[in-house]
Swiss-Prot record:
Name the record gives this protein: Arginase 1, mitochondrial
The species this protein was found in: Oryza sativa subsp. japonica (Rice)
Cofactor annotation: Mn(2+)
Taxonomy of the source species: Eukaryota, Viridiplantae, Streptophyta, Embryophyta, Tracheophyta
SUPFAM superfamilies per UniProt: Arginase/deacetylase
EC class: hydrolase
Amino acid sequence: MGGVAAGTRWIHHVRRLSAAKVSADALERGQSRVIDASLTLIRERAKLKAELLRALGGVKASACLLGVPLGHNSSFLQGPAFAPPRIREAIWCGSTNSSTEEGKELNDPRVLTDVGDVPIQEIRDCGVEDDRLMNVVSESVKTVMEEDPLRPLVLGGDHSISYPVVRAVSEKLGGPVDILHLDAHPDIYDAFEGNIYSHASSFARIMEGGYARRLLQVGIRSITKEGREQGKRFGVEQYEMRTFSKDREKLESLKLGEGVKGVYISVDVDCLDPAFAPGVSHIEPGGLSFRDVLNILHNLQGDVVAGDVVEFNPQRDTVDGMTAMVAAKLVRELTAKISK
């Protein structure tokens, strides 16, 4: 209920503004001030963190957390909007140590830093619609990337955020990337339920925009005829779970990013079997084990320039927060791939 209320609150604000006969110009100016303030906060935090890292020295790339708590483009439940703070809490909860499996220390700011969240709901409360909102997300990512050596690791949010994030990464780096996409679904509908920004359409937007050269989708087990047709249209390499045992060796020795601007990794938590991660909006049995995912990530060769972890839904998690810990572990191991 909370997610539905959050998703519709902005409509009532705009209606009240319209009833009060607020001019379109005045509304636009107000929206611009809110957006500028949001970007300024992220920019100043990124500058401060980057200055610290440069002063410390010895770092080429540091993973930088950026939360995008957006859930209204989900076709089912909007709980992923509440995920970023829960993931952060799980990262630092103290139930495990602060090292990644490869031995990188998360307490070292040269490995991981954080610039906070894009205030999605506050911006939407001002009547900002999705075309402009996606631009705000893209500009937020570019703001992080402007500060060397920060590289964005984005916390969703539903999977619609991957489109503006990948777009920003590609535009900022000056060319396409290769994408490793782990998911139960291909998210490549042209416009799911008429919404071009649906979480089920994000990779259609990415591919038609030319922001990726190769798109590898791993863990797929809920795919329609349109999903397969769209995959063929865009030359997507789709690896379905029904053939995973045959594909395992290849997927655990991937080499990506040569000849392009690097590798982007997008992890939808529902790529995992729900036995490992029940706190997702779209539960789809028959998925990857957590160790399957880690083997793919750990063995991947390529320069990982950015990534995201999406579709964790805290409202469907277990009482003890098992899926939050899973999402946090994914963030930790992606941090190890990005930082250097």
